[in-house]
């Protein structure tokens, strides 16, 4: 069976079953959050841009935020046969893309996105089994639902599976 590649945009999410592949490009300060049920081989990817929906007045796109995007992704995965007790997660992104002498919350959005993501996953009881976060470089990721591998591609920092 040929693998179908689903592209996930910014503030977007997609779900696939094996042998589907989920990919997102341009993870700078954004975080790509993969959730996976290794028994049902159901995978989901959400590309979040901001940590919390309650801190922004225009929060109509719930997939933009870690706190709401992860929960929506789980709902969609359950419709495809995933079991919430078996979910594991992998993370990539959360970079500090712009250097600044001012250590402000606005400039540390990547770090804040990673922290919020980890808080939400902990609250939901979903373990993080691998991550490639931080740094000052962008990432493109591909998740293979057939075997649970996450390919992380960077410019100048190599390519690796986590």
UniProtKB/Swiss-Prot annotation:
Disulfide bonds: none annotated. Keywords: Chemotaxis, Hydrolase. It comes from the Bacteria. GO terms for molecular function: protein-glutamine glutaminase activity. It catalyses: L-glutaminyl-[protein] + H2O = L-glutamyl-[protein] + NH4(+). Belongs to the CheD family. This is Probable chemoreceptor glutamine deamidase CheD. It comes from Caldanaerobacter subterraneus subsp. tengcongensis (strain DSM 15242 / JCM 11007 / NBRC 100824 / MB4).
């Amino acid at each position: 069976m040929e693998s179908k590649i689903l592209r996930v945009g910014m503030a977007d999410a997609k779900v696939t079953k094996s042998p589907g592949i989920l990919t997102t490009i341009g993870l700078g300060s954004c975080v790509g959050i993969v959730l996976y049920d290794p028994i049902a081989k159901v995978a989901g990817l959400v590309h979040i841009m901001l940590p919390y929906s309650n801190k922004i007045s225009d929060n109509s796109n719930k997939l933009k935020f870690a706190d709401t995007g992860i929960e929506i992704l789980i709902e969609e995965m359950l419709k495809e046969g995933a079991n919430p007790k078996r979910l594991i997660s992998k993370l990539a992104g959360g970079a500090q893309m712009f250097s600044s002498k001012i250590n402000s919350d606005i400039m540390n959005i990547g770090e804040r996105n990673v922290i919020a993501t980890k808080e939400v996953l902990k609250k939901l009881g979903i373990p993080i089994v691998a991550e490639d976060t931080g740094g000052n470089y962008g990432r493109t990721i591909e998740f293979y639902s057939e075997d649970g591998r996450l390919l992380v591609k960077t410019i100048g920092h190599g390519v690796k599976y986590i």
